[in-house]
Amino acid sequence: LNFEGPIIKDRTSFNIGLRRTWLDVLSAPAVAIANKITKKDGTRLRARYAFHDLNLKVNHIFNDRSRMYLSLYNGNDVLKGGSTDFPDQDSDNNYNYDSDVSLRWGNIMATAGWTYVFNNRLFGKVSGVFTRYHSRLRNTEHDVVGNEGDEDYSDSFRENETNTGITDFGLRTSFDYMPASAHHIRFGGDYLVHRFHPEYNRSVAYEKNEETSVEIGQEFANDLLWGHEAGVYAEDDWTLSSAVRLNAGLRFSLFNVQGKTYTGLEPRVSLRWLLDDNLSFKASYSRMNQYVHLISNSFISLPTDAWMPVTRKLKPLISDQVSAGFYYNLNK
């Protein structure tokens, strides 16, 4: 679904989009048919996948030079599966075993920004940003044998839950300045606060029988880290001639975590030289400092992958990238 329209004529407008999958609804009859077939064997299956997302944007025009916008995104996915084992039609046993696993993950992103045109050569933008990512993996097992009061009665339950997430919020500024037709200068800065929740594990279990009852609850690996990141940058997109174009810039970055501050310079330069209408030569160099790392499984990427910052002992990674080559356009 998508809706858009004015709130205040010629001043304020909105656009909202909603989306949801029908997969879980359409697959429900197939699961029901499968369970009808497997019921005589003492098995019941459960399966579900669904997602939804929401996009919202509101624009407001103060005047020809000044305008403001607000954007919001929210998306969530859920994947569930499980089964129940129980006595088949020909069995005299009395038991019930449930096993379930669920995976949930989602994002929230919100931005509020203001753009202003100072003159025909300079305009700028200021924005506040908020993002949050969270995932949760939970598996449960529930095993019941016999009836309460029977000599062979037992009831056991186990649940394990793993949560990961990262939350960012901060400010960004950017400016575009065109002092001459051959120069397009961009500059600005940003400050972000990171809240890392690499892993939070929770485990709950109990065992019951006619003689004893034991209940266990445990939390572990509940780490929480805060990081502060700031940077300023400037670059010039310089048209030297109709054939040669040069882009050069420099960024200064800073990252503070656990009382330790790391800084770094990140230069970058790129050149494009048109040799004729179809042939060009391009070369570039850039340096980057990586303060945040994605910790993932080496075999498969899952929503439970965790984000981790550098620490007092783990220094940032520095990468230098150089590329050069000739390019030919075959479409002309």
Question: Model-flagged regions — what are they?
Answer:
Residues L1, I16-W22, L70-N76, V126-R132, ...:
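Transmembrane beta-barrel strands of outer-membrane/channel proteins
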Residues L1-G5, L56-H60, A110-Y116, L171-Y177, ...:
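Residues on the lipid-exposed face of transmembrane beta-strands in outer-membrane beta-barrel proteins
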Residues L1-W22, I37-G81, S102-G124, P179-A180:
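Transmembrane beta-barrel wall of Gram-negative outer-membrane proteins
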Residues I8-D10, I61-R65, N119-R121, M178-A182, ...:
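Outer-membrane beta-barrel channels and translocator barrels
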Residues L23, A47, R65-V117, R132-G165:
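Flexible loop and strand-edge segments within Gram-negative outer membrane beta-barrel domains
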Residues K39-R44, N93-V101, M109-G113, S154-T162, ...:
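Extracellular loop and loop/strand-boundary signature of outer-membrane beta-barrel proteins
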Residues V78, D85, Q89, H134, ...:
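Surface-exposed extracellular loop regions of Gram-negative outer-membrane beta-barrel proteins
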Residues H184-S280, Y291-V292:
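Signature of Gram-negative outer-membrane beta-barrel scaffolds
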